[in-house]
């Protein structure tokens, strides 16, 4: 049975913290930016200290602020304790010519605190922090240090692909870097508090964070979910979440929930306001939202709304949902796109359902309700709006809304990185089977801009162009194995295409080729012969489409803006696979290393054709073990903990874990195929 999402048990590493006579309470060190300009920043350092000795004493607390190892400011406090008493230290420290933190320049400082008693060090604590201030209004949107920032966001789940739900620093940094390289500047942690390792990665790399409390409150979505203990646990979870997040400059928004079943009820409105108030009580430097879904919020109103939708568009008023839980909702939601989605989003009963929950949040968070963005401003002109979850293929229209309306502060796509669970939502079926029905052996959502092992898919490059981050064009070819066939699709799906011009056996077959470009024109060349110029750019949905009879060789696209060349992109046909190429894609590792493996020909050109797939075998000797081995294949019986895997789209990923992280002995990974290809890589422990 495929669970809705992976990771139902404990999957985040824990630590034991120790301290002596006067210790610094864990997660009770807080650094707050009070003010900042180019000349001066003022921060407040707050720490809770505990005397565990059975008598009173006077201790010393030294606070040092460092940047790149150099001390920039300091302060010393004398602290008097009574027996076994907790005492708080609060001090304001000026920092001259501060380096401000932002996604573009994620400058970090270190706050070092040392407690001493009888001239002996009792405890030490270090926390990274960033100097930055936030502002929010419907005229300027979201501002960081006075500069308006639009959130180019993605939702991500917490699994790390071929190593499952394990949390390693290296795994989180790898995902974070790939997302930043793809043009994202924000992550929504769906639907759980983000790991410390991912928060650290976001701080250093420059990714903004919406951290999310939970996927449900009192009403269950699936049997034995968090709703069973929500009333008993939410207060403690919020406390832990704020303590965990407070010193991370990347965290800017707390989400109190996702698609909450009771959000449109009086009880839901009460819980929502209570949760938002609790977050603000603990942290008044950040903003709150709730990822509201019109279908959930509608509740008993839904029948009346769907009746009106059915009358308007001539469809079944019961939709396509069956059963219950998350999958039924997602199946129903596939109807909520296009014109039907616009009509649904603006329905007066949807407005009524959203009213109370959205009003008690700082930011109105909307899932799949982009049709309400303009209406929300008419109804609540003092509020800002955020697309907390949206369809990937709608990015062109969604980003136009973000750019057009100042009160719309960003967009979070579902999803930027593929994940285990919700099997089938993005898998293309050409045999008449329905999507999102978890047909064995489907296991992945397969709707990530980036696939499970970190490869960017065509929609990722399309999105980067829509964002306005690159002038370089990109070529995507619909898979010729399915030429002339029609696939079933959900609203989350883009196109079944790949950036490849290797289609052995399909010579003469017409290929549907898209060239994505910000330029007003593109020109496509097949083996240096022009296939003509076509319009592209914003006015043509950033896409020029060609029908090209396949022949081996080169396929090159050149982008122009008013006849000025912007950039070019070229594909070459790969010959038969003769080699394996490996590359270490993580850096500064302490626990694990990621090794990407590609099938290539004699010239090093990657061969991603299905007909050329190979069964790979792997072994590790020396100071290492094979922690995970797999591909981005969304439907496979192979597991990630075997030493053999079949390539998918010409690649695979091996994750090696060191047996002894303190040892300098390397691990050696060997990968080979049954037809004689072999490669080895020596993995040094950094």
Annotate each language-model stretch with its function.
Residues 13-32, 36, 44, 98, ...:
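Active-site-adjacent substrate/metal-binding segments within catalytic domains
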Residues 46-137, 549-552, 571:
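Extended acidic/polar, glycine-enriched regions
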Residues 124-129, 564-575, 677-685:
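Edge beta-strands of extracellular beta-sandwich domains
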Residues 40-79, 89, 511-530, 555-559, ...:
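Beta-strand-rich binding/interaction modules
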Residues 56-62, 104-110, 510-512, 518-520, ...:
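Short flexible loop/turn segments that cap and initiate beta-strands
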């Amino acid at each position: 049975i495929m669970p809705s999402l992976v990771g139902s048990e404990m999957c985040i590493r824990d630590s034991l913290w120790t301290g002596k006579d006067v210790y610094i309470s864990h997660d009770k060190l807080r650094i707050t930016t009070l003010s900042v300009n180019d000349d001066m920043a003022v921060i407040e350092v707050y720490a809770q200290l505990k005397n565990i000795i059975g008598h009173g004493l006077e201790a010393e607390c030294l606070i040092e602020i460092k940047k790149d190892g150099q001390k920039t400011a300091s302060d010393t406090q004398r602290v008097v304790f009574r027996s076994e008493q907790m005492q708080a230290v609060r001090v304001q420290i000026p920092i001259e010519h501060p380096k401000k933190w932002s996604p573009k320049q994620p400058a970090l400082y270190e706050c070092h605190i040392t407690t001493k008693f009888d001239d002996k060090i009792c405890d030490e604590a270090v926390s990274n922090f960033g100097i930055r201030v936030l502002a929010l209004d419907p005229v300027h949107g979201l501002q960081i240090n006075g500069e308006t920032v639009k959130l180019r966001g993605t939702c991500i789940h917490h699994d790390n692909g071929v190593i499952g739900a394990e949390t390693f620093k290296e795994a989180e940094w790898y995902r974070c870097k790939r997302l930043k390289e793809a043009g994202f500047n924000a992550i929504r942690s769906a639907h759980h508090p983000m790991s410390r390792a991912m928060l650290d990665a976001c701080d250093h790399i420059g990714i903004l964070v919406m951290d999310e409390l939970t996927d449900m409150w009192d009403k269950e979505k699936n049997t034995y979910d968090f709703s069973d203990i929500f009333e008993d646990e939410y207060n403690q979870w919020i406390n832990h979440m704020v303590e965990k997040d407070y010193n991370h400059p990347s965290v800017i928004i707390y989400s109190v929930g996702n698609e909450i079943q009771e959000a449109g009820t009086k009880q839901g409105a009460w819980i929502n306001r209570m949760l938002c108030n609790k977050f603000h009580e603990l942290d008044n430097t950040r903003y709150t939202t709730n990822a509201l879904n019109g279908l959930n919020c509608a509740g008993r109103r839904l029948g009346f709304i769907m009746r009106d939708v059915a009358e308007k568009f001539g469809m079944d008023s019961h939709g396509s949902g069956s059963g219950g839980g998350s999958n039924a909702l997602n199946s129903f939601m596939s109807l909520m796109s296009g014109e039907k989605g616009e009509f649904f989003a603006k329905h007066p009963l949807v407005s009524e359902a959203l009213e109370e929950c959205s009003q008690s949040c700082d930011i109105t968070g909307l899932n799949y309700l982009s049709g309400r963005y303009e209406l929300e401003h008419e109804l609540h002109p003092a509020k800002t709006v955020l697309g907390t979850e949206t369809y990937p293929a709608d990015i062109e229209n969604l980003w136009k809304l973000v750019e057009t309306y100042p009160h719309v502060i960003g967009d979070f796509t579902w999803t930027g990185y593929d994940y285990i669970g919700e099997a089938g939502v993005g898998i293309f079926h050409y045999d008449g089977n329905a999507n999102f029905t978890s047909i064995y052996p489907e296991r992945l959502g397969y709707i990530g801009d980036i696939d499970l092992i970190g490869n960017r898919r065509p929609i990722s490059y399309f999105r980067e162009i829509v964002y306005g981050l690159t002038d370089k064009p990109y070529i995507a070819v619909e898979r010729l194995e399915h030429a002339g066939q029609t696939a079933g699709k959900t609203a989350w799906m883009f196109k079944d295409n790949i950036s490849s011009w290797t289609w052995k056996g399909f010579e003469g077959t017409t290929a549907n080729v898209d060239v994505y470009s910000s330029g007003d024109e593109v020109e496509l060349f097949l083996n240096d012969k022009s296939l003509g110029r076509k319009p592209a750019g914003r006015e043509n949905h950033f896409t020029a489409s060609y029908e090209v009879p396949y022949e081996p060789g080169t396929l090159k696209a050149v982008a122009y803006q008013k006849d000025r060349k912007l950039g070019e992109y070229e594909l070459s046909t790969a010959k038969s696979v003769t080699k394996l190429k490996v590359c270490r894609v993580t850096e500064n590792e302490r626990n694990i290393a990621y090794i990407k493996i590609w099938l290539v020909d004699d010239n090093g050109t990657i061969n991603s054709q299905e007909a050329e797939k190979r069964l790979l075998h792997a072994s590790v000797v020396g100071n290492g073990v094979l922690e995970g081995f797999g591909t981005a294949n969304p439907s496979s019986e192979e597991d990630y903990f075997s030493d053999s895997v079949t390539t998918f789209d010409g690649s695979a990923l091996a994750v090696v874990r060191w047996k002894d992280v303190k040892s300098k002995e390397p691990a050696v990974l060997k990968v080979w195929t049954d037809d004689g290809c072999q490669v080895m890589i020596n993995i040094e422990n950094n």
